[in-house]
Regions:
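N-terminal metal-binding scaffold of metallo-dependent hydrolase/deaminase domains
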Residues: 1-39
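Divalent metal-dependent hydrolysis catalytic cores, especially in the metallo-beta-lactamase
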Residues: 61, 76-105, 120-135
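Glycine- and other small-residue-rich loops at beta-strand/loop junctions that grip anionic moieties
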Residues: 67, 94, 143-146
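Divalent metal-coordination and catalytic microenvironments
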Residues: 10, 23, 28, 48, ...
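N-terminal hydrophobic targeting/anchoring segments and the immediately downstream early-domain regions
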Residues: 71, 82-85, 108, 112
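Fold-independent oxyanion-binding glycine-rich loops
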Residues: 9-11, 15-16, 47, 54-58, ...
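Metal-coordinating catalytic core of metallo-dependent amide/deamination hydrolases
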Residues: 107-155
Length: 155
């Protein structure tokens, strides 16, 4: 079995500074991060890409014209939009809606799991922003769709 290795050279965004450096990836895993000390930096450093950890979006309803409530296509479109903006994982968030819509949202999330790859952000789970909200604190949520957590229809 051969090992896939890749050296990524660029400007590393570190805890305390940005430094020229290299990340070594083997079989899809980062095995080393080596920052240069600044001595002898090459003149083309400004043209090197920034290399930073991916962002995690813990509350998103979609992006790039896609809505996660719009089934598998909305979930996939959102995942592709987010990765293009540095978000590597996310929690799609459903809105307060009729129960069948929330079930469809959960099913779209489940269907999106196999689509994970380098060109899509990974959904880590999902949030239901509603329907279990207090009517006193509903904000912009449609009160028609608010539900009691003890609702037997969810079984």
């Amino acid at each position: 079995m051969t090992s896939a290795r890749m050296d990524v050279i660029g400007r590393l965004v570190l805890d305390d500074r940005v430094a020229a450096g290299r990340i070594v990836v083997e079989d899809g895993l980062i095995v080393s991060v080596d920052a240069e000390d600044g001595a002898g930096q090459e003149s083309d450093e400004a043209s090197r890409p920034y290399i930073a950890p991916g962002f995690v979006d813990v509350h998103t309803h979609g992006g790039g014209g896609h809505d996660v409530m719009d089934g598998a296509a909305g979930m996939d479109g959102t995942a592709r939009h987010l990765i293009a903006h540095g978000v590597t994982s996310f929690l799609p968030t459903g809105v307060t809606a009729p129960l069948p819509d929330l079930v469809a949202f959960a099913e779209a999330y489940r269907a999106s799991r196999p689509a994970v790859g380098p060109d899509v952000a990974e959904p880590l789970g999902f949030n239901l922003e509603g329907p279990f909200l207090s009517a006193w604190r509903k904000g912009a949520h449609d009160p028609t769709f608010l539900r009691d957590p003890a609702d037997v229809a969810l079984d």
